[in-house]
UniProtKB/Swiss-Prot annotation:
EC number per UniProt: 4.2.1.113
Annotated source species: Mycolicibacterium smegmatis (strain ATCC 700084 / mc(2)155) (Mycobacterium smegmatis)
The UniProt record lists the keyword Lipid metabolism: no
Function field: Converts 2-succinyl-6-hydroxy-2,4-cyclohexadiene-1-carboxylate (SHCHC) to 2-succinylbenzoate (OSB).
Alphabetically ordered keywords of this record: Lyase, Magnesium, Menaquinone biosynthesis, Metal-binding
Keyword Lyase carried by entry: yes
Protein name: o-succinylbenzoate synthase
GO MF, any single term: magnesium ion binding
Family: Belongs to the mandelate racemase/muconate lactonizing enzyme family. MenC type 1 subfamily.
Superkingdom of source: Bacteria
HAMAP family (UniProt xref): MenC_1 (MF_00470)
Pathway(s): Quinol/quinone metabolism; 1,4-dihydroxy-2-naphthoate biosynthesis; 1,4-dihydroxy-2-naphthoate from chorismate: step 4/7; Quinol/quinone metabolism; menaquinone biosynthesis
Positions bound to Mg(2+): 138, 165, 188
Amino acid sequence: MTNGVPALDDILERLHVVALPMRVRFRGITVRELALIDGPAGWGEFGAFVEYEPPEAAAWLSSALEAAYRPAPAALRDRVPINATVPAVSAERVPEVLARFPGARTAKVKVAEPGQSLADDVARVNAVRESVPVVRVDANGGWSVDDAVEAAAALTADGELEYLEQPCATVEELAALRARVDVPIAADESIRKAEDPLRVVRAHAADIAVLKVAPLGGVARMLDIAAQIDIPIVVSSALDSSVGIGRGLLAAAALPELRHACGLGTGGLFVDDVAEPRVPVDGCLAVEPAVPDPARLAALAAPEPRRQWWIDRVCACHALI
């Protein structure tokens, strides 16, 4: 280990690359590729999305190495409430999706999907409202300020929204929108993809901070950022496997205060996972690490060209840590 960073050869000896098929298209993908590290302290997950270049993906590798090689922080709770995650499916498919989140009292609904209309979003959100009392929406920065104002009005015509997650792309747009709508604004990409993750908070551009462990560099780094934020925090998944979900649960469990359900229920989006799928009980997940099953690792192993691509990526990111 050099300067606290494990040796590259040791990491590569412990590496497994998997391809997880998804039930529905999510973030434009139908197969989720990622690398897992079987480390001395536990399993780590490196799942930076394939379009991310090494300077951005390096934080995700740091998160994986933290999980694999360093002791975990203490948890303050043994269960974490989660939201159901509803992709940009038709309203007719909403019951099928929600069935995978038993007991969930909060749902996050994807909106502003390219190729879809605001009417599609309204129909999907209203279908969710029939089964789940608390609804939040996530636009992934897909609206302009004016579009977001229109969408907020349409999406609240038949019921309240808990918040709009990343309705616009920039901090300036979020601040402008926050002054024009009554629905709370949550920031995600404006935190995890920013050089200064605290800028959106200092700019009073958000009411809620959505924090994701892997993009921020690990649980310790996420908790450090959380300690500097004076607005409520929601811990969310970056489309993680059960291994990454375990780290998100640990981070949420280590927060002094947790007012909102967390976005850590995305395991239901996979056809298969590297460990036994986590099933919510009364809308909560137990705080415990996931240990991949060897048979599942073998069955879900990525083809050799993709394995080599991930090995090359680990090497490139390791050089930047």
